A protein has these predicted regions:
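Conserved PLP phosphate-binding loop immediately N-terminal to the Schiff-base lysine helix
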Residues: 1-3
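Conserved glycine-rich beta-strand-loop-beta hairpin in the small C-terminal domain of fold type I
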Residues: 77-88, 98-111, 126
Length: 173
């Protein structure tokens, strides 16, 4: 909680939600701001919202107050760390190396083998029901085409790695 107070003093307004960590169906978020702004921000929220999901708010309140959200997050961190490790382990034999090994999160940016273009890999893969995010979709940097982003929560299928291997082989020849 102390961190949030520090954020409120330094940053003008910070908002977030629980849709990525708890459930996409829980459309309930939070805002961190200077205490003197909260009433006005609450009024603005009420004035611009068409509905309020009381059930979602009650579920969230319960999860936050009874400790189940904290337990859920701890388990989620363990699952994501395993998914990150497994994804990186599966990619390395293909010559796909993490640009940086993330300490947490759902994404890992990887550097493709020399001479392999991310957009070509993504085109091949999409035709084989594998959707990837090439670096040049995110950046205009001259080397962006050498990078690809993987969502580790969606990278636990052997079909992905077989398709990647085939795409790299085709692109390299």
């Amino acid at each position: 909680f102390r961190t949030f107070l520090i954020i409120a003093e330094v940053i003008l307004v910070f908002s977030g939600s629980f849709s990525k960590t708890l459930s996409a169906s829980i459309r309930c978020g939070y805002i961190i701001a200077k205490p003197e702004w909260i009433d006005q921000l609450t009024d603005l929220k009420i004035a611009t919202s068409f509905s309020h999901n009381g059930v979602s708010a009650e579920v969230l309140l319960s999860a936050l107050t009874d400790g189940s959200y904290r337990k859920h997050i701890e388990l989620l961190k363990v699952r994501l760390a395993k998914a990150m490790h497994d994804t990186i382990t599966q990619l390395e034999p293909l010559g796909i190396k993490p640009w940086i090994k993330p300490q947490a999160g759902i994404f890992v940016w990887c550097h493709l083998p020399k001479g392999v273009e991310a957009s070509e890999i993504a085109k091949y893969c999409i035709n084989h029901q594998v959707i990837l995010a090439p670096g040049n979709a995110f950046s205009q940097a001259s080397n962006a085409g050498q990078f690809i982003r993987f969502n580790v929560t969606q990278s636990n299928h052997d079909h992905i790695y077989k398709t990647l291997a085939d795409a790299i082989q085709q692109e390299s020849s």
